């Protein structure tokens, strides 16, 4: 028998911020949750400012485009703080990471 599948991730977010993101960028936080399904995605700590909590940036592809999702973990849930399409520097770095990754 194979390994048990991982439990589904649970997400939460501020609905007003999600709606503002939709108005500004054309997609909301619900759409951004798809980035976490990217098996070649990765996360890194977000230490740009002293936020008072651990924050992370997750890089994952949705429909062939790279997205950045900033989030924290609260009570076993992923709380999305912001999301955007990756910039050209991030896209290039992600491509290099994938090229350098060992084959599974």
Enumerate the language-model features and the residues they cover.
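Ribonuclease/tRNase effector modules and their secretory precursors
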Residues: 1-104
């Amino acid at each position: 028998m194979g390994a048990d599948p991982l439990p589904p991730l649970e997400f939460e977010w501020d609905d007003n911020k999600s709606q503002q993101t939709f108005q500004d960028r054309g997609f909301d936080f619900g759409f951004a949750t798809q980035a976490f399904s990217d098996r070649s995605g990765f996360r890194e700590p977000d230490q740009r400012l002293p936020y008072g909590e651990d924050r992370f940036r997750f890089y994952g592809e949705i429909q062939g485009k790279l997205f950045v999702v900033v989030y924290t973990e609260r009570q076993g849930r992923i709380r999305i703080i912001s999301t955007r399409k990756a910039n050209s520097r991030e896209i290039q770095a992600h491509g290099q990471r994938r090229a350098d990754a060992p084959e599974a």
